[in-house]
Every structure is written in structure tokens, then in C-alpha cells.
């Protein structure tokens, strides 16, 4: 019988000899060090901390333990297992290991060797390597495409670099990748990926490098490091690839991608107006990159030729097909004559950045051209992106954000293109003359401020910078006073609804100075209202005439009376004098109020003293000392009733003062007691803190004494050198500091005597 150790040892030796014969350097320490944990895990099995398998059994199979390692029948077991595996593999095609590795690297063009025939053990161990080349259920897939490319694939496989010397073909069976053996292989893989990315960029920029990109289209095996051709994708992948490349090329070269205002997509263009001059095959070729076909070519060069033909057809057909599709103008169309829309005008003609940033505004056409207004909406919307941009187009002229282009030529506005050809005639050139600008300014002023046409004509006669727009302006007879302005604005707003609506709309955002004018008529009205005061106005109104709501005038104090009596403006001093009563009435009213207040504050004794006509006040009666009070009484001739009232007032006053003093003393006493209580509480808290500290220090002292007592008692020895028992003896402290050793019974008696002495003293 062959022992297990000898069997395993011979197997390892044979494996090592086999590796050395192949030419691989075998260093067991390198494989078992901690620097390569994947190899260590592959050889020794997974760690026991992460798995429940029997990691000590090096002959562990998929079925677990078949027999005990020290069993006698171990040799028979291995023989039976080997024979059983041979019987099971009779219907399978057995391929040696070397042949399998060669089959992985070099692909058989005739497909005679299938991927579904290796044994079960080999399939389990080398599954990671097989998945990179063929799928688990591929088998032998012979199609017309693979047969057509078999010779090219053989040539590409022959050019593969040689296998590295550090890599053995048995490592593939272990499931270890090449990066485990060679750490520099990762850097090589990064370099290969970088080269592939650079080749893809060059492929996008220049079509002629398709063949070189095809030559670089190789896959590197993750375990062996050898290069083999990539699997040819199916029809769906190729279609997706061509679609992505076509879209990228269309974005880079086709003018439709750059025009943001293109009115319709490609499908709507082809369905709306098909071109009669083009054959149907040409239309299909134009949209071939965007449609998924059933069959797609595999040649990259043919794809690039198709894309180049698409680009050439687009460049030829832009000037003919797109203009006819978007707008087919009849010969006498006013739009083609007025706006110079030639049929051969390209879409991407010189477009400035300023014009491209403006949005379309087709609603402004009706203000200037009745022909454009009569067109349907669909035709005008499709016309907008095709307006020639080297002239002053409607989008840049009447856009909602371009006010400078309305009054300045394109050369001053900076939106014209210098490289453009001769400019086309501007359809709006004769509309913006000087007279029209003046009329527009006056019309805006009349609409915004609520003027009637008569007042607008009067303002037109004296149209200068100082005609009434400044605060202290020259007094012209044509300017309006405050009353005239208010009446005229109200009449104009009630007479025409359009002017009132425009004035209310424009007054919310216009900020163009005052509208009320300080004129001669205002000065005359103020002089008539003031009389001899001679008030000269030094201010001007800052209220707009379009604000007709009286609630909006409440912020100005000198305009509050306008909504009540409808009189002329008056000076603030005149308003104050008109509102206030005469001075005499003010004085009388103040005295009466003061007297009523004093009457309410007076007591009953004061009322009686005033009724009895006593010549001195109650304060003197109450507060004067006795001698001064008697002298005061001797100075006046008083009746008995007056004297009795004075004595009663003095007595009640003295009693009141005494009661007040008593209450004051009581309050002072209460306050003093409160202070004393607070002081006692503070003292109590302080004493409690001191008591706690004393108890803590006393406890510490007792602990120290107890520890010292135990230490001293533990060191005491009798004549024989034995320690004294603490249950029989105790230490006694004398007054002079000496310590005595006495029996425990005597010590207990002395302790009881000391306890009785305090009790006798209490009695």
C-alpha cells in the first residue's frame, strides 16, 4: 500500500520536474510569501476563517470526503475513482493539456475542435480563461462571417508576441491571471489601452487610418498575455457602431446640427415635401446612417466611404433641396422680393454670434409689412431661420432684447459680418427718418403721461431741454399748471380708453422726471390764496400725472387736501394756520384743562379750605412748627369756624404723617429682617460646606490610622516570632503617643466605659 505522504510528495516532485523541463524557474518561497496572496490561496486553499471546507484535505474533491486519509483502502479508493472517471469520459473527446493550450491561443479555422469537449475537471479549473474567447454555451459556431474572416484571423494570431518566460501554461489551469506573476504587466496593459484610445481618436479625425485601427483591434489574454483577434460582432453591434460614428460626423460637419432654429427634424422634412428631382435611392442614402438595416457591412473602409459620400451629398443638396423643402415661393411672392430670399441661399451663411443669440419674434412683422401679416403662421415660422444674416434681419432688428439695432446701423452696433458679400437692400431703411423719430417720441410722451393731442402739439412747438422737464424750469405759457394737468389728464383718460390703458401700463416702469410744471399761473394762484404773506414756492411736484388714485397721493403732506376740497395748492404754513384754532381759544382751553386736573387732585380738606377762604395753604398748616404756626394765626383775623377747620386740617395732617412714618418704619424693619435672613442663609451654606470638608478630612484621617494600625499590628511578634492574633489582642494609644498591646477583652471593657461617660453627663 502506498502511503498518503509518499503519494503527495511524489506528485509534487513530478510537478516540479515537469516545470523545470519546460524551462520555468521554480521557487517555492516566492509562491508562498505574503507578497503574492492569490497564488498562496490557489495552492494552499482558502483560509479557515472564511470557509467551512476541510482545508487540511489536499485531495479534497467536489463531493467532500470520500474516505479517511489514514484508511487502508485509500489506494483502492484512488484507483476506483480513476477508473470511474475514465468510464464517465468515454463519450467525451479527451484533449491533452498542451493541445488545449494551443487551441486557446490558435483558433482552428475549420472549427474541428469544439469548446464543449474538455473534461469536467479541466472545465472547472480553466473556466476563467475560456470565457474570454468563447461563451459557455457557444460550442462550434460556424457562420459565413467567421468562414470569411478565418484566414485573416490566422494571420493576426501568428503575429502574436511570444509568451513570457515567467508564465507557465499550467498556471492557466490554476485560474491565476498574468498580473499575479508579473506586476509590470499592469503597466504594459495601461500602455496598450492608451495606444488603443489614441488610435480611436485618430480614427475619428482622419478616415484613412481604418486599416491600421483594424490591425490594432486585438485582445490580450488576461492570463497568458498573448494577443488574439477580437470576436467579430453581430449585425446589431455593427449597426450601433455605425450609427454612433455617423451621429458624431453629422455633429461635426453637417450644418443642421449648428443651426439652433431649424424648424423641423429629418423625418418631418422627408415626409412633408419629397424632392421630385431626387431619385428615391438618393433619399434613402442620405438617411442611411440613421436607419437600422437588416444587413450591415463588416469592412470599416467601406463604412468610411459611405460616410464620406453622405457628407458630399449633403454639401451638394443643401443649396437645392432644403430651400425648396422649407419654403417654395411662387414667382410673385412679396416675401421673396422684399426680403431677398434666393433659392440658392445656404443655411449656414455668414451668421454672427449676436444674431444667433436672439430668438425669433414673428409677431413683430405685422407692425411694418401687411404682406407678412397676411401669410399663414406655418410659412412665416419656417421662414425665420432662412433670413440672410449678413443684412439687418428682422430677428436682430425687432427682437425683444435688441433695442440698439433699431436706431443704429449694423456697423455701429457691431453685429454685421465683415466677411459678407455686398449687403442686400434693407426693407426698413426708409421708415426710420428724423421726422418719424420725433413723432414717435412725442407719441410715447403723450401716451405715457396722459396728454391730449392739443397739449402734445403745444409741447412740440417748444421742444427743448428746458421746456418743463427740469425741476426749476423756465415758465412757458404752454406748460401746464397743477390744476390744468390734473383736469386734462382725467379728461383724456376718460375720453379714450387706449390712452388710459397705455398710461397705466407705462407708468409702472418709466422713470423720466417730473410732469407737473411750476409755471406763472401757479405763482398767480398762490399769490391770490396767500394775500400779504408773499409766499414764493421753492419746490416742485414729483408726482406723475398718470397716478390718479388719491390713495397714492397720501405720501405727500401738502397734497392731502386735493381729494377733499379741490382747491389750489397752499403753503404748509398756510395749511397749519388754517387748521389751528385762534390763540385766545387755545389759552382758555389749556387753563380750563389745568384747572380741572388740579380740582381732581385736591383732597377734601383743600376743598373745604378754599370754600372757607383760608389765606394760607394746607402745607403750611400741617408742616409748620408750633411757634411759627401760632404766629401765622395771629397775623390774620380768622373766625371760629376757620380756626376750627385749620386745627382739624393740622391734626389730620399730623396723623397722616405719623401713619406714614409708622408704615415707613415697619417697611424698613421688614427689609432689615430680610437682609438678616439672607445673611444667615449664606452663613449656613458656608458652614455646611465646611462641615462636608471636615467630614471628608476626618474620614481620610481614619483610613490612614486604620492602615497604620494594621501595619503596626502586622509587624508585632511574640517571643516565638509568631504574629499576634487580631481577635485576641488590640492596640491602645496612650496620651503621650505610646502604643500598648492589650488583650481584646480589656480593650472592649474600656471602650464601653468611655461610651457610658457621655450618657451620664447628659442625664
From Swiss-Prot:
| Chain positions covered by the region annotation Cholesterol recognition/amino acid consensus (CRAC) region | 180-188
Q: What domain comment accompanies this record?
A: The cholesterol recognition/amino acid consensus (CRAC) region directly binds cholesterol, as well as campesterol and 27-hydroxycholesterol. Has much lower affinity for epicholesterol.
Q: What are the transmembrane regions?
A: 7-24
Cellular-component GO terms for this entry: endoplasmic reticulum membrane; nucleus
Q: Where is this region: Leucine-zipper?
A: 673-687
Mark the residues carrying the PTM Phosphoserine: 519, 590
Its source organism is Bos taurus
Where is this chain compositionally biased, Basic and acidic residues type? Answer: 589-604
Gene designation: NFE2L1
A GO term for molecular function: DNA-binding transcription factor activity, RNA polymerase II-specific
**Record's keyword annotation contains Transit peptide:** no
Keyword Repressor assigned:
yes
Q: Which protein, by its recorded name, is this?
A: Endoplasmic reticulum membrane sensor NFE2L1
> Which intervals hold domain bZIP?
645-708
Where in this protein does the record put region Basic motif?
647-666
Where is region (Disordered) located? Answer: 108-150, 460-523, 585-604
What binding partners and quaternary form does the record give? Interacts with KEAP1.
Residues bearing carbohydrate: 338, 350, 413
Amino acid at each position: 500500500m502506498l502511503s498518503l505522504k509518499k503519494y503527495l510528495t511524489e506528485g509534487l516532485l513530478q510537478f516540479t520536474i515537469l516545470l523545470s523541463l519546460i524551462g520555468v524557474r521554480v521557487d517555492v518561497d516566492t509562491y508562498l510569501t505574503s507578497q503574492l496572496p492569490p497564488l498562496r490561496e490557489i495552492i494552499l486553499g482558502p483560509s479557515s476563517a472564511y470557509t467551512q471546507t476541510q482545508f487540511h484535505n489536499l485531495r479534497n474533491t467536489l463531493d467532500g470526503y470520500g474516505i479517511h486519509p489514514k484508511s487502508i483502502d485509500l489506494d483502492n479508493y484512488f484507483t476506483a475513482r480513476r477508473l470511474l472517471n475514465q468510464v464517465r469520459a468515454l463519450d467525451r473527446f479527451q484533449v491533452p493539456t498542451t493541445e488545449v493550450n494551443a487551441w486557446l491561443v490558435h483558433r482552428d479555422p475549420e472549427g474541428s475542435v469544439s469548446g464543449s469537449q474538455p473534461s469536467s475537471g479541466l472545465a472547472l479549473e480553466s473556466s476563467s480563461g475560456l470565457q474570454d474567447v468563447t461563451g459557455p454555451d457557444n460550442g462550434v459556431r460556424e457562420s459565413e462571417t467567421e468562414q470569411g474572416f478565418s484566414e485573416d484571423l490566422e494571420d493576426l494570431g501568428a503575429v502574436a508576441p511570444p509568451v513570457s518566460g515567467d508564465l507557465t501554461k499550467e498556471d492557466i489551469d490554476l485560474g491565476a491571471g498574468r498580473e499575479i506573476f508579473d506586476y509590470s504587466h499592469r503597466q504594459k496593459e495601461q500602455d496598450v489601452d492608451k495606444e488603443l484610445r489614441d488610435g480611436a481618436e485618430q480614427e475619428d479625425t482622419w478616415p484613412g487610418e481604418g486599416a491600421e485601427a483594424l490591425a490594432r483591434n486585438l485582445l490580450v489574454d488576461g492570463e497568458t498575455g498573448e494577443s488574439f483577434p477580437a470576436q467579430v460582432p453581430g449585425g446589431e453591434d455593427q449597426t450601433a457602431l455605425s450609427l454612433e460614428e455617423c451621429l458624431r460626423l453629422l455633429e461635426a460637419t453637417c450644418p443642421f446640427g449648428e443651426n439652433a432654429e431649424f424648424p423641423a427634424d429629418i423625418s418631418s422634412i422627408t415626409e412633408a415635401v419629397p424632392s421630385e428631382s431626387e431619385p428615391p435611392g438618393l433619399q434613402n442614402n442620405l438617411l442611411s446612417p440613421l436607419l437600422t438595416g437588416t444587413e450591415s457591412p463588416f469592412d470599416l473602409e467601406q463604412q468610411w466611404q459611405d460616410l464620406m459620400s453622405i457628407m458630399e451629398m449633403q454639401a451638394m443638396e443643401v443649396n437645392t433641396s432644403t430651400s425648396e423643402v422649407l419654403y417654395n415661393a411662387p414667382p410673385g411672392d412679396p416675401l421673396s422680393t422684399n426680403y431677398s430670399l434666393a433659392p440658392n441661399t445656404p443655411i449656414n451663411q455668414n451668421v454672427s454670434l449676436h444674431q444667433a443669440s436672439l430668438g425669433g419674434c414673428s409677431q413683430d412683422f405685422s407692425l411694418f409689412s401687411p404682406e407678412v401679416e397676411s401669410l399663414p403662421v406655418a410659412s412665416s415660422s419656417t421662414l425665420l431661420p432662412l433670413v440672410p444674416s449678413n443684412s439687418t434681419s428682422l430677428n436682430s432688428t425687432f427682437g425683444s432684447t435688441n433695442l440698439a439695432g433699431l436706431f443704429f446701423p449694423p456697423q455701429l452696433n457691431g453685429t454685421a459680418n465683415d466677411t459678407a458679400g455686398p449687403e442686400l437692400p434693407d426693407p426698413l431703411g426708409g421708415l426710420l427718418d428724423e421726422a418719424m423719430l420725433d413723432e414717435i417720441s412725442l407719441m410715447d410722451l403723450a401716451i405715457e403721461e396722459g396728454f391730449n393731442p392739443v397739449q402734445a402739439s403745444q409741447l412740440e412747438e417748444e421742444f427743448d431741454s428746458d421746456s418743463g422737464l427740469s425741476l426749476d424750469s423756465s415758465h412757458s405759457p404752454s406748460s401746464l399748471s397743477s390744476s390744468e394737468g390734473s383736469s386734462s389728464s382725467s379728461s383724456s383718460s376718460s375720453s379714450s380708453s387706449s390712452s388710459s390703458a397705455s398710461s397705466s401700463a407705462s407708468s409702472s416702469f418709466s422713470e423720466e422726471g417730473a410732469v407737473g410744471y411750476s409755471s406763472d399761473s401757479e405763482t398767480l394762484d398762490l399769490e391770490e390764496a396767500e394775500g400779504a404773506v408773499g409766499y414764493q414756492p421753492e419746490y416742485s411736484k414729483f408726482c406723475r400725472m398718470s397716478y390718479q388714485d388719491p390713495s397714492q397721493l397720501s405720501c405727500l403732506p401738502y397734497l392731502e387736501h386735493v381729494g377733499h376740497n379741490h382747491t389750489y395748492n397752499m403753503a404748509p404754513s398756510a395749511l397749519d394756520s388754517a387748521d389751528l384754532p385762534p390763540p385766545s381759544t387755545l389759552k382758555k382751553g389749556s387753563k380750563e384743562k389745568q384747572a380741572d386736573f388740579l380740582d381732581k387732585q385736591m383732597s377734601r380738606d383743600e376743598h373745604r379750605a378754599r370754600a372757607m377762604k383760608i389765606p394760607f395753604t394746607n402745607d403750611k398748616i400741617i408742616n409748620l412748627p408750633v411757634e411759627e404756626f401760632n404766629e401765622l394765626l395771629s397775623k390774620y383775623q380768622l373766625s371760629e369756624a376757620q380756626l376750627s377747620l385749620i386745627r382739624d386740617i393740622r391734626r389730620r395732617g399730623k396723623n397722616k404723617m405719623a401713619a406714614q412714618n409708622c408704615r415707613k418704619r415697619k417697611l424698613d424693619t421688614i427689609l432689615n429682617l430680610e437682609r438678616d435672613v439672607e445673611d444667615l442663609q449664606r452663613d449656613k451654606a458656608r458652614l455646611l460646606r465646611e462641615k462636608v470638608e471636615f467630614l471628608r478630612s476626618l474620614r481620610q484621617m481614619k483610613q490612614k490610622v486604620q492602615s497604620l494600625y494594621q501595619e503596626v499590628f502586622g509587624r508585632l511578634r511574640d517571643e516565638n516570632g509568631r504574629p499576634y492574633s487580631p481577635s485576641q489582642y488590640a492596640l491602645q494609644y496612650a496620651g503621650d503617643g505610646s502604643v500598648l498591646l492589650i488583650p481584646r477583652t480589656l480593650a472592649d471593657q474600656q471602650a464601653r466605659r468611655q461610651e457610658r461617660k457621655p450618657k451620664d453627663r447628659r442625664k
